[in-house]
């Protein structure tokens, strides 16, 4: 595990129960915890889930896989799955892997939440 990897489970905030903030490195060591948090959210079948990556510094293939699986599950029951707040390093990783074309990505959580309320979801940031 890298020094800035998130060693603890992501914390959901009461005022935004469908927003999952992630921080540090989302890698092989942390992705099982992320997956567990996502599974707990998905079990409730919310109409939307927003992943806040504004404090995440790195993501590897295990982290990407956790997000892809979650997105597929959410969209499978008719929900919406958004990513928000990607910093330049993460944005580059998503662009290189072309996953920026797969995920709905927004500049911040508020924009993602607003988009999830509208009937038309337009741009990826």
Where are these regions (language model features)?
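Amphipathic alpha-helical interaction surfaces in cytosolic regulatory modules
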Residues: 25-103
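Short, low-complexity, intrinsically disordered N-terminal peptides in bacterial proteins
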Residues: 1-6, 122-125
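Short leucine-rich amphipathic alpha-helices used at interfaces
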Residues: 8-9, 48, 117
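Conserved catalytic submotifs in the C-terminal HATPase_c
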Residues: 15, 54, 110
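STAS-typified acidic loop motif
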Residues: 3-36
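A charged, well-structured terminal subsegment
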Residues: 105-125
């Amino acid at each position: 595990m890298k020094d800035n990897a998130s060693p603890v489970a992501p914390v959901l905030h009461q005022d935004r129960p469908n927003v999952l903030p992630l921080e540090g490195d989302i890698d092989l060591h942390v992705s099982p915890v992320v997956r567990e948090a996502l599974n707990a959210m998905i079990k409730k079948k919310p109409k939307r889930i927003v992943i806040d990556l504004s404090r995440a510094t790195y993501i590897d293939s295990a982290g990407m896989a956790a997000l892809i699986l979650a997105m597929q599950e959410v969209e499978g029951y008719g929900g919406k799955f958004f990513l928000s707040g990607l910093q330049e390093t993460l944005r580059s990783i998503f662009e290189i892997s072309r996953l920026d074309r797969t995920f709905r990505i927004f500049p911040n959580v508020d924009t993602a939440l607003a988009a999830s309320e509208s009937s038309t979801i337009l741009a990826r940031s």
